[in-house]
Swiss-Prot record:
One GO location term (cellular component): cytoplasm
EC number: 3.2.2.27
This protein's name: Uracil-DNA glycosylase
Record has DNA repair as a keyword: yes
Domain of life of the native organism: Bacteria
The organism's taxonomic lineage, starting at the top: Bacteria, Pseudomonadati, Campylobacterota, Epsilonproteobacteria, Campylobacterales
Length: 233
């Protein structure tokens, strides 16, 4: 079995990244990920959603990048069935999943900054379809084990995605929340893109609420595209 057999990737992204897929580092990622799928361990998101962030936002449509760390590793119960919270988009959860604390803080800050109504569900797919790439630096995780797939090597791949976008699309609005995401500043060409930073929205971090991050994103979007980004969900 090949990676794209169980984890579909759109033609647009396959063409955009085609030179990466035969490189040794990517073949090693593929090997390690497929081994993880075959193991008794449960891997999130489900493989069909591994590249959901890319599939919802084609490379030519990317206007904003909101970089996450790795997928949610927890589950929730629905009709006595255990389901993953992770669904392939950074910070986002499925329509029926409980809204995690970090996402609650994102919605609070969005409402405080722009007056956007706090939604009742945490599915951010609509943002992705409007040009916000909701990419996690690490694309998979083992159930109940945060950052457990760091060893797979996903960051080498996500770094290449970012660098290719930085070369191809100008200017982009790059949103980096927290110290781990902000390490990616080193990848961003100077004076070409708008970089917006803020503390991580986790309740364990301080300073996200009141940071004005969504005001900054909206101002940047107006500057580039002369209109507001639609944050409604």
């Amino acid at each position: 079995m090949k990676l794209f057999d169980c984890a579909p990737l759109s033609l647009a992204w396959r063409e955009f990244l085609q030179s990466e897929f035969k490189k040794p580092y990517f073949l090693e990622i593929e090997k390690r990920y497929l081994e993880a799928l075959k193991s008794p361990k449960t891997i999130f998101p489900k493989s069909s959603n591994l590249f959901y962030a890319l599939n919802l936002t084609p490379p030519s449509a990317v206007k904003i990048i909101l970089l996450g760390q790795d997928p949610y590793h927890s589950t929730y119960l629905k009709n006595q069935q255990e389901l993953p919270v992770a669904m392939g988009l950074s910070f986002s959860v499925g329509k029926n999943a409980p809204i995690p604390p970090s996402l609650k803080n994102i919605f609070k800050e969005l409402h405080a900054n722009l007056g956007v109504s706090v939604p009742c569900c945490g599915d951010l797919s609509a943002w992705a379809k409007r040009g916000m790439l909701l990419l996690n630096a690490i694309l998979s995780v083992e159930k109940n084990q945060a950052a457990s797939h760091k060893r797979i090597g996903w960051e080498a791949f996500s770094d290449q995605i970012l660098m290719r976008l930085f070369e191809a699309n100008a200017p982009l609005i790059v949103v980096l929340l927290g110290k781990i995401a902000q390490k990616k500043i080193a990848l961003i060409p100077k004076n070409k893109h708008i970089i917006i930073t803020a503390p991580h929205p986790s309740p364990l971090s301080r300073g996200f609420l009141g940071s004005g991050v969504f005001t900054s994103i909206q101002n940047a979007h107006r500057e580039i595209y002369h209109k507001d980004f639609d944050f409604s969900l």
